[in-house]
UniProtKB/Swiss-Prot annotation:
<feature type="disulfide bond">
    <location>
        <begin position="276"/>
        <end position="287"/>
    </location>
</feature>
<feature type="disulfide bond">
    <location>
        <begin position="47"/>
        <end position="55"/>
    </location>
</feature>
<keyword id="KW-0677">Repeat</keyword>
<dbReference type="Pfam" id="PF00273">
    <property type="entry name" value="Serum_albumin"/>
</dbReference>
<keyword id="KW-0446">Lipid-binding</keyword>
<keyword id="KW-0106">Calcium</keyword>
<feature type="disulfide bond">
    <location>
        <begin position="2"/>
        <end position="48"/>
    </location>
</feature>
<feature type="disulfide bond">
    <location>
        <begin position="358"/>
        <end position="367"/>
    </location>
</feature>
<feature type="disulfide bond">
    <location>
        <begin position="192"/>
        <end position="238"/>
    </location>
</feature>
<comment type="similarity">
    <text>Belongs to the ALB/AFP/VDB family.</text>
</comment>
<keyword id="KW-0862">Zinc</keyword>
<dbReference type="GO" id="GO:0005737">
    <property type="term" value="C:cytoplasm"/>
</dbReference>
<dbReference type="GO" id="GO:0005615">
    <property type="term" value="C:extracellular space"/>
</dbReference>
<comment type="function">
    <text>Serum albumin, the main protein of plasma, has a good binding capacity for water, Ca(2+), Na(+), K(+), fatty acids, hormones, bilirubin and drugs. Its main function is the regulation of the colloidal osmotic pressure of blood.</text>
</comment>
<feature type="disulfide bond">
    <location>
        <begin position="116"/>
        <end position="161"/>
    </location>
</feature>
<feature type="binding site">
    <location>
        <position position="51"/>
    </location>
    <ligand>
        <name>Ca(2+)</name>
    </ligand>
</feature>
<keyword id="KW-0479">Metal-binding</keyword>
Amino acid sequence: KCRIIREFPDIVFKGLTLVQVSQKFGKAGFEDVKKVTEEIVHLNEDCCKGDAVECMMERMEATDHICEAKDKLSSKLADCCAKSILERTPCLLALPNDESDLSKELKNYYEDERVCENYKKDKLLFLAHFTHDYARSHQESSPQSCLRVSKGFEGLLEKCCASENHAECLKQAPILLEAALKEIEELRKQNCGALQLLGFRDYNIQLLFRYFFKMPQVTAPTLVELAGRMTKVAVYCCGLAENKQQTCAEEKLDILLGEMCEKEKHTFVNDNVRHCCVDSYANRRKCFTDLQRYPNYVAPKWDESKLHFNEDLCKGSEDDQIKKKLEVLVEYMKMKPDCGPEKLKEVVEAFRKIDIKCCAAEDHQKCFDDEKAGLLQIIEAH
């Protein structure tokens, strides 16, 4: 939260909080949700300044105010509000979302003849109402996805309300809303399907390759860590009920990518990564997903000494061994970025066979020394 407050305009965190509160209290009216949102935004801004005592006091005040308004917000609040002051906050955070009985179509936002009049009167307020209604009627969508839809709808309103026939133009709205849902559903199926088909190890390698080509300048350990954490996110989230998978994945990837962007912000590895990190919070995950191969990468001169085929690959925990082996693959790709998928597959399989053989051998190092020439022959045949 503090990273979002620091790195993006105020309206981003306000919008994110509005979505989260709207989804939590799905039956609550806009004005009540707005009050809670404003208080949560204010307390987080203060908490991020580092005053722990003031932060705790404001958090307790906020929970008091939520409990005072419990009848307006949610029927599920009674149990949490009956707890002690210290127990209330964790209880509220763990509270399941209140389902809304609102239609997902939200036709009043694009079929009403006064849409453009109302939008022009107060654009921010109109969009806040839309965001509130969209979020509470789409509980299966992540907060980031809801913000993307809201941003897309804003763009449509700007275009249509400036046109001569705005009613005709606004007929694109349901197409836009449906496309957003279709995209995230396809992404969910694609990733969970690939994980199920490939298994942890090969899905991890696939992600490693995919992100290497997006950001080939990143160091091997950083790339291996990123792909590994993404794979663990997929394993956890794809194990949940289908309607929870997308929200789970996007929220966890949002934290992961935020951490990476924080580390990279002083010297971004390339312009594409910089663009994804700083241009739009709502579109950050989508931006990284959509990134294509970085076109301006210049590979270093071939140097086989960077490929550490030795007994170290068999030492340490299983996780440590996997990381070291994947780092060798990244170093290979850095020097041979133009190898195609078939060549990559051939190299991975050859490396895997030698690794299994040598780590099972009595003398690991002698085995690697004996096998290295044959592996390098496969690697360099490009």
